[in-house]
Amino acid sequence: MKPTSSFLNLPQSGIRRMYDLAKNKKDTVSFVLGEPDFVTPKHIIEAAKKKLDEGCTHYTDNAGILPLRQEISRALKQYDKVDYDPEGEIVVTVGGMMGMYMAILALVNPGDEILIADPSYTNYVGEIVMNRAVAVPVPVYEKDNFNFTYENLKSRVTDKTKAIILNSPCNPTGGVATRETMETVAKVALE
């Protein structure tokens, strides 16, 4: 059986391509996967083992383990002063990309457009394409600290625009969204 055209037309991950090139090179410092260069701390490993020994080896709720969602809710309230219901407003996914995929699936229809910074994390395009939406690159520049400006963001909006992906700090540029950037994105979204 041959793979579908949807599968064959997915863009290859530039990050994985770089990972494959660098993995067998000596003295290479890899910035590819965004994982730490240290072993998981011992107390975390021991806590995971303890939970396994206690029988926590089965499927979780679809939204994730309730005590974890409750702790996330508590932390959000304490640190960010926002209140989310752990039983209906918080979902734990198996990773950031799965969370992005689910958010895109929930918010856009096939053919809808999603604005993304250019340059941006290469896997965003794949996530968007897998949801049969259209990635619309919005150039960001060093002179603007790789932040969206009103003009460059607004110029890419069409009647098909349904979402804007804002990643801060941005991979790969390192740009950090300022309050002004957040207000700009909100203004464009509301218009």
Where do the language-model regions lie?
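Conserved PLP-anchoring active-site segment centered on the Schiff-base-forming lysine
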Residues: 106-128
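Short acidic capping loops at alpha-helix termini that bridge into adjacent secondary structure
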Residues: 83-90, 110-113, 160
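Active-site phosphate-binding strand-loop segment of PLP-dependent enzymes
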Residues: 136, 141-191
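A generic structural signal for well-ordered alpha-helical segments
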Residues: 22, 128, 188-189
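A short helix-loop-beta submotif of the ANL/AMP-binding
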Residues: 130-136
